[in-house]
Amino acid sequence: MSRSLKKGPYINVKLEKKVLAMNESGKKVVVKTWARASMISPDFVGHTVAVHNGNKFIPVYVTENMVGHKLGEFAPTRTFRGHAGNKKK
């Protein structure tokens, strides 16, 4: 189920403040965040956000196509090792 339109999108307040401050100053600094559930707003476009995947921070460069998605979608938490198969001799 998606979030109610009445509530609006969830954007982490601290993350939004940091991005807006960078937009005003014109600096491009990588911002670390643990807020994987935070939605990407149009203000984030052009910035790099380091999203925590449970082990380390994955740098995510935000483009226009990512607006409306959540930050956690672009930082996978699991590594796929491959299915079991026949060992080649």
UniProtKB/Swiss-Prot annotation:
PROSITE patterns: RIBOSOMAL_S19 (PS00323). GO terms for cellular component: cytoplasm; small ribosomal subunit. Belongs to the universal ribosomal protein uS19 family. PANTHER family: RIBOSOMAL PROTEIN S19P FAMILY MEMBER, SMALL RIBOSOMAL SUBUNIT PROTEIN US19M. NCBIfam families: rpsS_bact. Protein S19 forms a complex with S13 that binds strongly to the 16S ribosomal RNA. This is Small ribosomal subunit protein uS19. It comes from Phocaeicola vulgatus (strain ATCC 8482 / DSM 1447 / JCM 5826 / CCUG 4940 / NBRC 14291 / NCTC 11154) (Bacteroides vulgatus).
